């Protein structure tokens, strides 16, 4: 079954992409959609029936050369099971939604066949992500990692007639190459130090890596910290963290279903998954974890500030994704990997619903995306309105404080903020502020879109209509997850340390528990006279057990938490004001948004006029694009022109053209003049040749 889940989307993609002329475009759409729903059902069966014990499922010997051996295998553990349901559920619903959304696309003419290609790309995207999350070694993961990058390039640039779409696709691809270079260096370093790319073998050697110093860039580094940092650079690119985030908003150039798939289930979650998968390494790399916390918290704050002033409905949600990913990285950085995965799971439901809801709004408004041209749509598209409301309740964290009752984001985001309080004061305060901003821009979206009087094109508003059932049914399914996912899975993900340990089969935990029980049992039954053991024997056994525990501890579970990692327990005992602070931030953001856009709609304009520098700073996304244009893009273009004109044009082409059009014609003209046709000229040349040969022979004889 696991192999079917992995390879079925690939087969469907190939049939739809290469064989749609034979089976028909409509059949290609239904084939890919049906296969994804079947994979989704199997994934849920695997998730619900999984006992937590990791399994290794071989597929084939992939790379065998010299001493290097890498097989293609499926690693099925709790992390994999979670990602399987996230990827296949969202992808199946996006496929279904796309049947309606892509039915009539104004970017294509009636005689252009684009639907089969689109669905083939979607299915290939899904396969690449499944390849990534089921990987049993870093090479296999990198294959899926790059496959996701290629698929995102194809889908972001799907409207290839638009220059902006082509530019966005190139930007996403190039920025991710920067992160991928760091990921590759990390893989090379791990293989160089451990001799393997297989996860269990790497994890087995992590304690030794933590005690190893290596020379890199003219200074000594702790191996575990350096490798953790390099791997996280790859995660920064894929998950659009600060400094490598600039591609994510531009990715909105692709069709809206693509945005839902990228932001909720596939590409951007890959970085979070990578850090959680490599938790045994990060538990021995404290400096790398601190770096993750700083980047994650700063990204959450940065993206939330930019989202305050965005007017494109899709870009608002895009920046919310960037911000929420920062939350996940903070959780992973402080060592509560289960909380990071918890938020990844709940976020998939409400973020996919928000994007698909935005697509429904855009569909109703004839592809208008500027929220300033919306208004009063809640009566026109009531199903979409309620779906977006539920998504907003979830992302802003609506729930009952100090209880486990609330929408999905209420429980998962609060778990991260409480963990941040226990692990990093810097991250805690930035996340609370970001929660307030998240509430503000989320309710701003709701108020501008669904409340007030119609603005902009009144013809579009008058003819606005609800989306067909094929588009609203996925919204309803996702709404169920956005409401109940947090309450259902709070316990095994964060609620109790013992439950989390059992659920994720945390490496070393069961071994230690078993040893403790055996020791207690032996102590209770052993006679007093046998309680005193031979000192040397006891010390030898203790040393052997310590050595065994040190080697085995990071291996055998979905995640690993060091015995000294007590952040989750400390988070559970955080003060009440810490647990209530996200709710207060949410209410403050809601009240501010209501004041700005319902009670006093002229206030935002006046405030922007009063603080123009701050407004432009946020509207221009902290000027990251302009800074990168000045520091990287222009110098790169200048260097490219120099190498093109001076290197390729002047040196390479100049040399070849100079020889071909200058030297060779002159030599041929000289040769023509030598061929005079007179016999005595040829005889004289022969005599000169013979004389020359004789002189050469005599000179060699003299030596």
From Swiss-Prot:
UniProt-annotated location(s): Cell inner membrane
Primary location recorded for the protein, binned into one broad class: membrane
InterPro entries according to UniProt: NADHpl_OxRdtase_5_subgr (IPR018393), ND/Mrp_TM (IPR001750), NU5C-like (IPR003945), Proton_antipo_N (IPR001516)
GO biological process: ATP synthesis coupled electron transport; electron transport coupled proton transport
Membrane topology: Multi-pass membrane protein
Stretches that traverse the bilayer: 4-24, 30-50, 79-99, 116-136, 138-158, 179-199, 224-244, 256-276, 290-310, 325-345, 346-366, 381-401, 415-435, 475-495, 580-600, 679-699
Keywords assigned by UniProt, alphabetized: Cell inner membrane, Cell membrane, Membrane, NAD, Quinone, Translocase, Transmembrane, Transmembrane helix, Ubiquinone
GO molecular function per UniProt: NADH dehydrogenase (ubiquinone) activity; quinone binding
Class in the EC hierarchy, top level: translocase
Entry EC no(s): 7.1.1.-
Catalytic function, reaction form: a quinone + NADH + 5 H(+)(in) = a quinol + NAD(+) + 4 H(+)(out)
GO CC terms of this entry: plasma membrane
The family this protein is said to belong to: Belongs to the complex I subunit 5 family.
Summary of subunit composition and partner proteins: NDH-1 is composed of at least 14 different subunits, Nqo1 to Nqo14. The complex has a L-shaped structure, with the hydrophobic arm (subunits Nqo7, Nqo8, Nqo10 to Nqo14) embedded in the inner membrane and the hydrophilic peripheral arm (subunits Nqo1 to Nqo6, Nqo9) protruding into the bacterial cytoplasm. The hydrophilic domain contains all the redox centers.
Described function: NDH-1 shuttles electrons from NADH, via FMN and iron-sulfur (Fe-S) centers, to quinones in the respiratory chain. The immediate electron acceptor for the enzyme in this species is believed to be ubiquinone. Couples the redox reaction to proton translocation (for every two electrons transferred, four hydrogen ions are translocated across the cytoplasmic membrane), and thus conserves the redox energy in a proton gradient.
The protein, known as: NADH-quinone oxidoreductase chain 12
Organism of provenance: Paracoccus denitrificans
Gene: nqo12
């Amino acid at each position: 079954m696991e192999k079917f889940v992995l390879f079925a989307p690939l087969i469907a993609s190939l049939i739809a992409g290469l064989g749609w002329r034979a089976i028909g475009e409509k059949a290609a759409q239904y084939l890919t959609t049906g296969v994804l729903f079947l994979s989704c059902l199997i994934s849920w069966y695997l998730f619900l029936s999984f006992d937590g014990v990791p399994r290794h499922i071989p597929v084939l010997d992939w790379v065998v050369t010299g001493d290097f051996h890498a097989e293609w295998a499926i690693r099925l553990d709790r992390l994999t099971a979670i990602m399987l349901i996230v990827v296949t559920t969202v992808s199946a619903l996006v496929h279904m939604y796309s049947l309606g959304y892509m039915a009539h696309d104004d970017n294509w003419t009636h005689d252009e066949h684009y639907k089969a290609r689109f669905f083939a790309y979607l299915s290939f995207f899904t396969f690449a992500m499944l390849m990534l999350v089921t990987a049993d070694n870093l090479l296999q993961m990198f294959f899926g990692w790059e496959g996701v990058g290629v698929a995102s390039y194809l889908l972001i640039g799907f409207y290839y007639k638009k220059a902006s779409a082509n530019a966005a696709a190139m930007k996403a691809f190039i920025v991710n190459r920067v992160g991928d270079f760091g990921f590759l260096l990390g893989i090379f370093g791990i293989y160089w130090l451990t001799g393997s790319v297989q996860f269990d073998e790497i994890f087995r050697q992590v304690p030794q890596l933590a005690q190893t110093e290596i020379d890199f860039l003219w200074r000594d580094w702790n191996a575990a910290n350096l490798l953790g940092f390099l791997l996280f650079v790859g995660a920064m690119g894929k998950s659009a963290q600060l400094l490598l985030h600039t591609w994510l908003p531009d990715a909105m150039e692709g069709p809206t279903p693509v945005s839902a798939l990228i932001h909720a289930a596939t590409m951007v979650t890959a970085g979070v998954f990578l850090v959680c998968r490599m938790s045994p390494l990060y538990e021995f790399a404290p400096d790398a974890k601190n770096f993750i916390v700083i980047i994650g918290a700063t990204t959450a704050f940065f993206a939330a500030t930019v989202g305050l002033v965005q007017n494109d409905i899709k870009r608002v949600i895009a920046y919310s994704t960037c911000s929420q990913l920062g939350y996940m990285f903070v959780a992973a950085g402080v060592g509560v990997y289960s909380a990071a995965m918890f938020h990844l799971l709940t976020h998939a439901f409400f973020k996919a619903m928000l994007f698909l809801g935005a697509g429904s709004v855009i569909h109703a408004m004839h592809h208008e995306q500027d929220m300033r041209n919306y208004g009063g749509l809640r009566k026109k598209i009531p199903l979409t309105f309620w779906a977006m409301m539920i998504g907003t309740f979830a992302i802003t964290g609506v729930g009952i404080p100090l209880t486990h009752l609330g929408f999905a984001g209420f429980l998962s985001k609060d778990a991260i903020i409480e963990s941040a309080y226990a692990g990093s004061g810097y991250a805690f305060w930035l996340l609370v502020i970001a929660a307030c901003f998240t509430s503000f821009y989320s309710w701003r979206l709701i108020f501008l879109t669904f409340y007030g009087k119609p603005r902009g094109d009144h013809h579009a508003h008058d003819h606005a209509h609800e989306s067909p059932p094929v588009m609203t049914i996925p919204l309803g399914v996702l709404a169920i997850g956005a409401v109940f996912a947090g309450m259902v899975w709070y316990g095994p993900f964060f609620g109790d340390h013992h439950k989390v340990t059992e659920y994720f089969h945390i490496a070393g935990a069961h071994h230690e528990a078993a040893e403790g029980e055996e020791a207690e049992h032996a102590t209770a039954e052993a006679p007093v006279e046998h309680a005193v053991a031979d000192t040397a024997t006891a010390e030898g056994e203790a040393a052997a057990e310590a050595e065994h525990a040190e080697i085995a501890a990071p291996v055998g579970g979905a995640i690993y938490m060091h015995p000294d990692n007590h952040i989750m327990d400390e988070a559970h005992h955080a003060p009440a004001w810490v647990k209530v602070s996200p709710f207060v931030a949410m209410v403050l953001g809601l009240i501010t948004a209501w004041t700005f856009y319902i009670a006093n709609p002229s206030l935002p304009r006046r405030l922007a006029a009063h603080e123009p520098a701050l407004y432009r700073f946020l509207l221009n996304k902290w000027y990251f694009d302009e800074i990168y244009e000045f520091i990287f893009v222009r110098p790169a273009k200048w260097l490219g022109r120099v190498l093109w004109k001076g290197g390729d044009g002047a040196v390479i082409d100049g040399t070849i053209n100079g020889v071909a059009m200058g030297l060779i014609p002159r030599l041929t003209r000289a040769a023509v003049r030598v061929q005079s046709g007179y016999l005595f000229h040829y005889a004289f040349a022969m005599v000169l040749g013979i004389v020359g040969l004789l002189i050469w022979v005599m000179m060699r004889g003299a030596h």
